[in-house]
Regions:
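Flexible, low-complexity junctional segments that flank or bridge functional domains
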Residues: 1-213, 218-220
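A short acidic (Asp/Glu
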Residues: 222-224
Length: 224
């Protein structure tokens, strides 16, 4: 209650609510705020979003696309702090606002790596500008405002499946099943998923496949 007063903005209130909801530890319990990236991108001004594409890897935050700040930072630069807040402390703060089943850090990391352009501004109170300190750099770098929304790093080469469900024989002993979505329910398209699994298992059995790889990268779960 002490955090909320007559000067509290919508963004601040929503961020506080997220922390309360996230404390439940259930990925199916969330506010509309931050649950749907498309909704958030429609109401957050472009100039308020974080202007770099970044990725959190092993508790380190790296630039994977400098966007319109290519003259200031480079791909693979490690960001040590943003607006004076150490990266580790910033991530810890953001994690407290992400709903995840049993507070899974793996899920929270994936969520951050998807919605970083929104979560970083929320955590910092929507600053008018962003300044970063990068490893190996002496001076703080003031970033230019976003001229397009920074999106999650996606390498199309990692997913050669044209559809959501694919079976591929790599060699005589190995096969790969790609499942890009679990959006198959009994009242909708569950028969499609079941038929795919059944037919794939039949092919694998008939081909005497010994090694099966199940690829669920970029699978956001159900209701996607």
């Amino acid at each position: 209650k002490l955090l909320i007063n007559e000067k509290t903005t919508y963004a601040e209130f929503a961020w506080h609510c997220n922390a309360i909801i996230a404390s439940i530890g259930c990925s199916h319990t969330a506010s509309s705020n931050m649950q749907n990236a498309y909704h958030e991108l429609s109401i957050v001004p472009l100039e308020k979003t974080f202007p770099l594409t970044v990725r959190l890897i092993n508790d380190q935050l790296f630039v994977v696309n400098p966007m319109n700040n290519a003259d200031k930072v480079n791909v693979k630069d490690e960001i040590l702090s943003i607006n004076g807040v150490e990266t580790s402390k910033l991530i810890t703060s953001i994690y407290k606002h992400i709903s995840a089943q049993a507070n899974s850090e793996t899920y929270k990391r994936q969520k951050f790596n998807t919605y970083f352009a929104l979560m970083i501004p929320y955590a910092l109170g929507f600053p008018t500008s962003f300044e970063v300190n990068c490893k190996g750099r002496v001076n703080t770098i003031k970033l230019k405002q976003s001229n397009e929304y920074a999106r999650e790093l996606y390498d199309p080469s990692e997913n050669v499946c044209a559809d959501n469900l694919c079976l591929e024989k790599v060699d005589a002993n190995t096969a790969v099943i790609t499942i890009s979505s679990f959006n198959y329910y009994e009242w909708d398209s569950y028969p499609v998923f079941k038929a795919f699994v059944d037919s794939s298992m039949k092919v694998i059995h008939q081909s005497n496949i010994k090694n099966l790889i199940i690829d669920v990268r970029y699978n956001g779960g159900g209701s996607q």
